[in-house]
Amino acid sequence: MSSPGRFGQMYAPLRVPNYRMFLAGQTVSTMGSLIQMTAQSWVVYELTHSSAALGTVAMLGSLPLLFLSPYAGTLADRIDRRKLLYGTQLILAGLAATLAILVQTGLIQLWHLYVLAVVTGIVTALDGPALQAFAADLTGPTLIRQAVSLNMMGFQVSRMVGPSVAGLLVGFYGSATAFWVNAASFLAVVLALLRVRFTNEGASGQRGARSGAGGGTTMDAVRHILGNANLVNFYIYPLLYMFGAASTMTLYPVYVGDVLHRDARALGTIVGAWGAGNLATSFLVLPLVQNVRRTGLLSAALLIWFGAMLALLWAISLPPVMASIEASGASLGLPDPVVLAACVATFLSGATGPIVLSMASGLQQMMAPPTMRARLAAIGTTITFGTQPFVNLAVGYTGEIFGAPTALLANGVFVTVLVLLLVTFRRSVRAEVIRPHTMVNPSQPGPAASAPDGGDRTPAPAHAPARAGGAPVSSAHA
C-alpha cells in the first residue's frame, strides 16, 4: 500500500462521529491529567526536595493498578461501561478539585498527596479498562487497530502540550490553577459520553456487558494470552518500555531543580519535548508501520530509547559537558542551551514510545475475542502499569542514594540487557507475527479462515473476550 493510502487507512476511525467526539473529550481530559501530574511533581519537590518522596507518590498512585485492574476489567465486561465511566470521571474531577483547594489554601502536606495519590489510583484502576474497551465499542471491529493508534496520537498531543501548559500555569499562576484545570477537563469526557449514540456494529461490546455475555473470569483471559506466544510478546514489550522510560519521569523534577538549577517552566519544557517526540512519531511514523511484520522493531525502539536516554544523562549530569554546552550555546546566541540540549535528548527518547505502545496495544486487541476485551486491557494495565509502583520506588530511592543521573543510567542498562536477552533467546520475537486477520462472529466460535498469505489457522476461543471495540482474532503464532 502506498504511503498516502496508509495515512488514509490510519485516520479511518475519524469518520465515525461517536468515536470522533469521544477521542476529543478523552484527549482534553488526558491533557488535564498530565498538567496535574507535572504540577503535582513540582509541589512534592517544593515540599521535600526528595527523590524518594517523588518515587513514593508515584508508587502510591500506581499501586492500585496492580491489585484492582484485573477485577476492573471483569467489571467492565459485565456492566454498562458508559455508566461506569460517568462515575469515575466525576470522582476524578472531585479529587483534582480537592487537591486544588489544599494547595490554594496553603494547607497541603505530604501526607495529603500520599492519600490523594492512592484514591486517584483506585479510581483510575476502575476507569482504565472501561475507557479502553468503550473507545473500540464505538468504532466497530474493523477499525480497532487504527483506533488504538489514534488514541495514542491523542495521548501524545496531550503529553506534548500538557506539561508545557503546566509549567506556564505553575510559573505564572501557581500550582493550584493547574489542578483546577484538570478538574474541569474531566467534564469533556462526561459531555462526550452524553452525546454518544451507538450503531449496531459498535454496540456489540455494550450489549454483551449488559447481558452478561462477558461472564468469564480473569483466568480465562490469562489462559487466552498464554496460549499464543506472540500475544505474550505484546505484553512484554510495553512492560519493558514502561519499566525503562516512564519510571524515569519520576526523576525529572530532581534533574531540573538540582542538576540544571531551573524552575517549573523548564521542567514543563523538557517533559513537553518528550511528548513532542511521541507526537512526531505518532503522526509521521505510526501510519507507515501499521503493517510491519517483524516485532523486532519494538525491541529496536527500546534500544533507541536507551541511546537517547544516555545522551540525556551525559548532556545534563556531567559538569564538563554542561559547561561546554553553555559555552557553545552562548556563542551561537541560543537561549538556555542546556535546557535545549535536554529537550533534544528527551525528544529523541520520547519518539520510540508510540511504536512500542501502540503496536502492542493494537495487536493485543486484534487478538482478543469480543467479550474479553476489557479483561485483556486490564491485564495489560496490570502488567505494564501495575509494576510501576515498585519501579518508581526503586528509581526514587536509587536517585536519593546515588543521584538522579546514576539512577537513570542503571535503569537504562538494565532495560537494554533485558531487551537483548529477549531478542536472543525468544524465537517468536524475531518471527513474522503480523498477518492479515480474519473476522469471526463472536456468537459462532470456530476456526478462523486461513490468512491470504498462507498463515496458519487459529481456532477462536469458545468464550469471546471484550476489549477495545470489535472482534478480529489474529492468526499469528510463535
Predicted segments, located by residue:
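Juxtamembrane intracellular "pre-TM" segments in multi-pass secondary transporters
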Residues: 2-19, 199-236, 259, 441-450
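Helix-loop boundary and gating motifs at the non-cytosolic
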Residues: 3-64, 229-274
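Membrane-helix interface/capping residues of multi-pass secondary transporters
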Residues: 19, 51, 81, 110, ...
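Substrate-agnostic recognition of the 12-TM MFS/MFS-like secondary transporter fold
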Residues: 20-37, 61-74, 80-95, 112-171, ...
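Transmembrane alpha-helix termini and helix-breaking/packing motifs in multi-pass membrane transporters
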Residues: 41-47, 100-105, 161-181, 258-259, ...
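C-terminal transmembrane bundle of multi-pass solute transporters/carriers
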Residues: 57, 67, 71, 84, ...
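Small-residue-rich packing faces within the transmembrane alpha-helices of Major Facilitator Superfamily
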Residues: 62, 93-100, 156, 183, ...
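Helix-loop junctions on the cytosolic side of multi-pass membrane transporters
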Residues: 106, 133, 137, 179-209, ...
